[in-house]
Amino acid sequence: MIVGYRSTIITLSHPKLGNGKTISSNAIFQRSCRVRCSHSTPSSMNGFEDARDRIRESFGKVELSPSSYDTAWVAMVPSKHSLNEPCFPQCLDWIIENQREDGSWGLNPSHPLLLKDSLSSTLACLLALTKWRVGDEQIKRGLGFIETQSWAIDNKDQISPLGFEIIFPSMIKSAEKLNLNLAINKRDSTIKRALQNEFTRNIEYMSEGVGELCDWKEIIKLHQRQNGSLFDSPATTAAALIYHQHDKKCYEYLNSILQQHKNWVPTMYPTKIHSLLCLVDTLQNLGVHRHFKSEIKKALDEIYRLWQQKNEQIFSNVTHCAMAFRLLRMSYYDVSSDELAEFVDEEHFFAISGKYTSHVEILELHKASQLAIDHEKDDILDKINNWTRTFMEQKLLNNGFIDRMSKKEVELALRKFYTISDLAENRRCIKSYEENNFKILKAAYRSPNIYNKDLFIFSIRNFELCQAQHQEELQQFKRWFEDYRLDQLGIAERYIHDTYLCAVIVVPEPELSDARLLYAKYVLLLTIVDDQFDSFASTDECLNIIELVERWDDYASVGYKSEKVKVFFSTLYKSIEELVTIAEIKQGRSVKNHLLNLWLELVKLMLMERVEWFSGKTIPSIEEYLYVTSITFGARLIPLTTQYFLGIKISEDILESDEIYGLCNCTGRVLRILNDLQDSKKEQKEDSVTIVTLLMKSMSEEEAIMKIKEILEMNRRELLKMVLVQKKGSQLPQICKDIFWRTSNWADFIYLQTDGYRIAEEMKNHIDEVFYKPLNH
């Protein structure tokens, strides 16, 4: 039966339902952190549409918070005409006007774990003010802040900006040259290490921390981008002008930023690609992307255009490259894993990027590596997957993540993405979403167009609306269950929840309520049929059921072998006739023969399994076994029937096409193998036929399991390829293909990477969170 959902028994009590590309660009290497705040759940539709309109507008905005650190470095650039005058005096004005009450500079509002960031930004601002002999009062207050907070310099619980251990001590040296008296203990280990450090390679991104020791001419030659910057970093580009004052393109780059922001600069620029990638990813994670389909398509079209052009905003940055690959591939764009080939070797990766690589780059590479769609050619992704997985697992073992959210993100990424329920993940992302979320490079920053009150409230309200719809549909499903007295056929009421959860994962679109309920009903009906042919009915009764289906419109003349068959067929007949009526209204044509043929094919093969295989009369080949059992598992019946309820008219020719056959075949193999891997020991004891027992006739159990996992992965990749890659001449709408992939996802979700069922309590909590528990709990 489909996805083997009955293997997990859940008892859930609820009053509503009764009982029961050169890597040296570290400029986007960043850590995402969140500031927790209380959730205020909107109780009505007030503002929902307005918030949606404002979110749509955010696609046209590129917003990043001011960086005190980078602005200070730009402020230190001398005029082209006089070394005694600032080139950008407006930045000095901004520094003077934006000192915080405690005497510091940095992200506003700040965060208790960002003291190192504040210390770095404050010292940079003090250097700028002291260099140009302005802001005496601000300097005094800034020195006071550094004196009182210098304990944080070597504190391991504090989040460090990238390159802090190089840049901060270097700025201390610069302060000494300017006779700026810092009350800092130079015996602090961070400072001591850096002052004794012989600078080596892989530190170009934080070259401002190396200063005069850098070969700036060589750095500009090797790393200057088309926009004139070094690594899209205003601070590093400014440092090039401070220590090597002869580059017109660097000046033009900084001028272009100040033309936009007047008197301050962000910590990276340009930010359009970064903002678009993060915004699309965030909308998907929050589960609200369906409200912004046209905006997301326009954004991804732009990213794909740049991908094809090998634009440096994507390919000079690990995070951008990996994220673009993942978002584009999962959105049906043709992208090749060849573009990630530079990252296949861990040693090479770290040799180029150095130790200043945060977990975000590794995390994004790992996410991208899970999207292999070709067993022969995607060894690039396999190699990336292997070393990134090992790296992150080691990080977890060593407790190498400073904040809880980073650790959680890595734990989720280490589970295959197709084993994670989107619904639960949407809830988790909403719960952890914060308006004051920040990320950190050499300075902490925020993205107001990605993290804001509008998106927060909109996501909550969207989740509430979906949750309310699910509760209403569950009521309908329960009434159907009771009206057809399915409990009399061995189906306990407790299966309502997990069956419906299956349907929600496969058909999540709110507007497809009929398809979702059809899917859930068919899973239960298939379970009943499976029970009858597996153990509840005799062979004569099974033959009786087949004849009743064959003579569907004249079933009364067939008669019943038993009362049990009568009750069963009566339920099956009424249910299917009801669904046929709805399907024919939606399609505007007769679909009854096609649906009945699917049922007839299924029950005949179920009988063959029972009479021929399970009795030991014949032993099927591996191919025959997988073909037959994929059908009896429901991999044709349920997805194909669901196609009629997806809001589009679909011809019988399409549903009988080779493309559909391939989708059914791969889906069925994935479902069957996952089930057999779980049940192998139990089935061996019962002397039943499984792919495990068949392979063990010629090899050991360990070898059989290994071989089966290879077959599983091959079919999963082939299925993903058929769903994601646009086949020339295909007439099958994308939503029809998606049903097959999501069906396999549900099986992976249940079997959890083939190492054990989700325990009942975990599934109960999952159902509770998705269907009932308010977000503020």
UniProtKB/Swiss-Prot annotation:
UniProt binding sites for Mg(2+) 2: 530, 534
Cellular localisation: Plastid, Chloroplast
InterPro entries assigned to the protein according to its UniProt record, in alphabetical order: Isoprenoid_synthase_dom_sf, Terpene_synth_N, Terpene_synth_N_sf, Terpene_synthase-like, Terpene_synthase_metal-bd, Terpenoid_cyclase/PrenylTrfase
Enzyme's top EC category: lyase
Catalysed reaction, written as an equation: (2Z,6Z)-farnesyl diphosphate = (+)-alpha-santalene + diphosphate; (2Z,6Z)-farnesyl diphosphate = (+)-endo-beta-bergamotene + diphosphate; (2Z,6Z)-farnesyl diphosphate = (1S,5S,6S)-alpha-bergamotene + diphosphate
Cofactor: Mg(2+); Mn(2+)
A single Gene Ontology CC term: chloroplast
Keyword Chloroplast part of the UniProt annotation: yes
Keyword annotations from UniProtKB, A to Z: Chloroplast, Lyase, Magnesium, Manganese, Metal-binding, Plastid, Transit peptide
Record EC number: 4.2.3.50, 4.2.3.53, 4.2.3.54
Motif mapping: DDXXD motif: 530-534
Pfam families hit by this protein: Terpene_synth, Terpene_synth_C
Entry GO MF terms: alpha-santalene synthase activity; endo-alpha-bergamotene synthase activity; endo-beta-bergamotene synthase activity; magnesium ion binding; terpene synthase activity
Transit peptide (first-last residue): 1-36
Residues reported in the UniProt entry to bind Mg(2+) 1: 530, 534
Comment field on protein domains: The Asp-Asp-Xaa-Xaa-Asp/Glu (DDXXD/E) motif is important for the catalytic activity, presumably through binding to Mg(2+).
Functional summary from the UniProt entry: (2Z,6Z)-farnesyl diphosphate cyclizing enzyme. Produces (+)-alpha-santalene, (+)-endo-beta-bergamotene, (-)-endo-alpha-bergamotene, and at lower amounts, (-)exo-alpha-bergamotene and (+)-epi-beta-santalene. Not able to use geranyl diphosphate, E,E-farnesyl diphosphate or E,E,E-geranylgeranyl diphosphate as substrates, but able to use Neryl diphosphate to make the monoterpene terpineol.
Family as reported in the entry's similarity comment: Belongs to the terpene synthase family. Tpse subfamily.
Name assigned to this protein: Santalene and bergamotene synthase, chloroplastic
